[in-house]
UniProtKB/Swiss-Prot annotation:
InterPro entries: Ribosomal_bL20, RIBOSOMAL_L20_CS, Ribosomal_protein_bL20_C. PANTHER family: 39S RIBOSOMAL PROTEIN L20. Binds directly to 23S ribosomal RNA and is necessary for the in vitro assembly process of the 50S ribosomal subunit. It is not involved in the protein synthesizing functions of that subunit. CDD domains: Ribosomal_L20. The keyword Amino-acid biosynthesis does not apply. The lineage of its organism: Bacteria, Pseudomonadati, Pseudomonadota, Gammaproteobacteria, Moraxellales. The gene is rplT. This is Large ribosomal subunit protein bL20.
């Protein structure tokens, strides 16, 4: 049986890891052992942050809706409650976009919410 030298395989594997650390600072982009740890950690951060991204965007939408609602004399929770009672089916992402870019339409929604709360 012939002797298998693993130089080619190891070199290819190292090259793959070092390619993923391109742009990293110092040894993290040059030394395989450090680069491998950096790639593992980057993967952990990416996994965690894909989940955090959803929470952060929801928090941003709520902050924007709250700001728009307060300009129209409502709090965020009263605005959402009023819209639910008025049977306005609109998600927070779209509502936040309306609050940012179309104040007139948002004011109309706020009035609808106020009407539903009063009734």
């Amino acid at each position: 049986m012939a002797r298998v030298k693993r130089g080619v395989v190891a070199h290819r594997r190292h090259k793959k890891i070092l390619a993923r650390t391109k742009g990293y600072y110092g040894a993290r982009s040059r030394v395989y052992r450090v680069a491998f740890q950096a790639v593992i950690k980057a993967g952990q951060y990416a996994y965690r942050d894909r989940r955090q991204k959803k929470r952060q965007f929801r928090a941003l939408w709520i902050a924007r809706i709250n700001a728009g609602a307060r300009q129209n004399g409502l709090s965020y929770s009263r605005m959402i409650d009023g819209l639910k009672k008025a049977q306005v089916i609109i998600d927070r992402r779209v509502l936040a976009d309306i609050a940012m870019h179309d104040a007139v339409a948002f004011a109309a929604l706020a009035e609808k919410a106020k009407g539903a709360l009063a009734a």
